[in-house]
């Protein structure tokens, strides 16, 4: 075939540039979508301590958060009838990634029980949504509540001893109660509903670890209105023994035995360090297990006064170690460890039967370190009894125990020198003075009679 001189085939550059343009646009859109300036995550609106009830006098904090910064926010408040009582719109030019402010209060006074709704919106500086940014809207509905709970003490123990216990019966009136506790100034105690609605009974302890005692009933409602009512109870400052114990080399045998049993792989630089670890760290671990077992219980309505019999778990026993003893251990004239003795040591014959003085339920049956084989028996109203250094368990975890039943036998497990029982009483996990709970007269005057007085007043008020 003959070739025609001067002919040249045309190239379609137009189509090529169209494809190239579309690819470029696609890449631009993709990279823009992945870019921080086009991020699509909406701002976060956090309202602190917001419930269904609100006291305008309390400050409610709002936190606005966004990774691309907050551009603007608005707050609109309307009443139940649709009336607008607040309308705020703000542009935030300094571009904070976190903005804190307080929920604004309408200028007009709102009546008790009024319904108010807030709509809070926040928009960020992102260029997404056609450069308008991402917006979050949050709605809050409140009932106005400015009245604090009312507290009235019905009956209480006249006095409390350092290390001892007291019973308080009171009335707390509030339809929207969020928190109700009784405090000794340090620890908090859960009240038990007693007889009728709004009435409560609580045993409170003054542990030896606390040098002061301030009995307070603290009630807080859903709008965070709070009442702190101080109960008038006479404080008796009973002293406890302060013991200095000088250790000799022969005293470390039991420590070596416990360390080998409890922490066989742990290395100690000295006998003093080993003694301190066993006496303080292992003791702390034991007492946490005891606290957990004796402070977790069902809070049920008490339908009649609780009658406690005096506790005396070991018949014919002698006391060989007192409660509240502050012990300071010295080795070669150096103080190496300190601890409190939070029970009563009682000795009788070897493997003596341990008797439950009051009915209860076994909530702990465990081999501990310092305390050895241990039972905790829960009796109700936050009261538990402790039995340690046991040789033989006679009952099992979860068993319901009747008054007078044998639950175990005394022994020398744990850190015990000779067969004896370490006996303790706890009020909601706090060790208390044994002499009170082993005294029938004290129980009658400080527990039983207070229950009965409270019952009489409550039933009279219901008529």
Model-derived features: positions:
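Short edge beta-strand/loop segments characteristic of extracellular beta-sandwich folds
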Residues: 59-66, 156, 164-173
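N-terminal Lys/Arg-rich, disordered targeting/topogenic segments
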Residues: 1-13
């Amino acid at each position: 075939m003959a070739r025609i001189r001067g002919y040249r085939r045309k190239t379609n550059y137009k189509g090529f540039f169209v494809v190239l343009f579309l690819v470029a646009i696609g890449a631009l859109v993709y990279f823009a979508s992945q870019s921080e300036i086009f991020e699509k995550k909406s701002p976060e609106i956090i309202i602190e301590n917001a419930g269904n009830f609100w006291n305008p006098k309390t400050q409610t904090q709002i936190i606005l958060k966004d990774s691309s910064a907050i551009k603007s926010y608005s707050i609109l408040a309307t009443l139940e009838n649709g009336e607008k009582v607040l309308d705020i719109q703000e542009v935030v030019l300094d571009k904070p990634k976190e903005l804190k402010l307080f929920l604004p209060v309408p200028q007009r006074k709102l009546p008790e029980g009024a319904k108010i709704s807030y709509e809070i919106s926040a928009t960020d500086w992102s260029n997404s949504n056609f450069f308008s940014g991402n917006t979050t809207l949050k709605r809050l509905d409140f009932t106005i509540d400015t009245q604090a709970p009312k507290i009235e003490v019905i009956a209480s123990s006249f006095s409390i001893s350092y290390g001892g216990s007291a019973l308080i019966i009171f009335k707390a009136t509030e339809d929207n109660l969020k928190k109700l506790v009784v405090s000794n100034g340090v620890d908090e105690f859960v009240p038990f509903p007693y007889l009728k609605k709004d009435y409560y009974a609580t045993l409170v302890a003054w542990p030896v670890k606390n040098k002061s005692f301030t009995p307070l009933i603290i009630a807080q409602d859903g709008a965070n209105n709070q009442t702190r009512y101080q109960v008038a109870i006479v404080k008796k400052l009973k002293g406890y023994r302060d013991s200095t114990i000088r250790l000799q080399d022969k005293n470390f045998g039991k420590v070596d035995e416990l360390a080998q049993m409890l922490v066989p792989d742990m290395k100690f630089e000295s006998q003093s360090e080993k003694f301190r670890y066993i006496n303080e760290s292992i003791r702390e671990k034991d007492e946490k297990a005891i606290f957990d077992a004796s402070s977790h219980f069902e809070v049920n309505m008490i339908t009649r006064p609780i009658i406690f019999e005096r506790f005396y778990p070991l018949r014919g026993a002698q006391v060989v170690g007192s409660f509240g003893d502050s012990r300071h251990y010295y080795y070669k004239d150096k103080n190496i460890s300190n601890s409190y003795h939070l029970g009563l040591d009682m000795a009788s014959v070897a493997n003596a039967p341990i008797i439950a003085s009051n009915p209860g339920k076994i909530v702990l049956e465990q081999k501990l370190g310092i305390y050895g084989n241990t039972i905790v028996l829960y009796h109700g109203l936050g009261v538990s009894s402790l039995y340690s250094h046991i040789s033989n368990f006679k009952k099992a975890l979860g068993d319901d125990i009747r008054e007078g039943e044998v639950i175990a036998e005394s022994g020398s497990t744990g850190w015990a020198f000779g067969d004896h029982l370490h006996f303790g009483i706890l009020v909601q996990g706090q060790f208390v003075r044994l002499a009170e709970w082993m005294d029938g007269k004290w129980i009658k005057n400080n527990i039983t009679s207070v229950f009965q007085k409270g019952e009489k007043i409550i039933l009279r008020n219901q008529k």
